[in-house]
Amino acid sequence: MCIRDSYKDAPLYIPPYEYYNKEISAWAKSMGIQVVNFTPGTASNADYTTPDMKNYRSSKSIYDQIMALEKKEGLNGHLMLIHFGTHDDRTDKFYNGYMEKMIKTLKRKGYTFTPLREAVGFW
């Protein structure tokens, strides 16, 4: 079996640390994989940080940033990266409360949530 054939069920790729360049993009394309990344501005990707880090963002500050951005320019089409596995030192896991609050708030505002494959047109 060719490696390329095994990617049919996972055609989307978020590179480690969300870092990629032309070489990574070309590699992915040659394998039939689409590189995707989060939309900057919401700070949702900072949910991995721990209190000892210089760039630490609490779950409340992440939630507040998302809501502030929504109020300022809307979130239609935004891709948010939320980590479902974070270090034990991060005791305020975004997914243990603020994620549900965010989803409910955005649904009340008329937003819908779309599977990633559909959102990026990769069905």
Question: Which residues does each predicted region cover?
Answer:
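Catalytic domains of cell-wall/extracellular-matrix polysaccharide-remodeling enzymes
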Residues: 4-81, 85-107, 111-112, 117-121
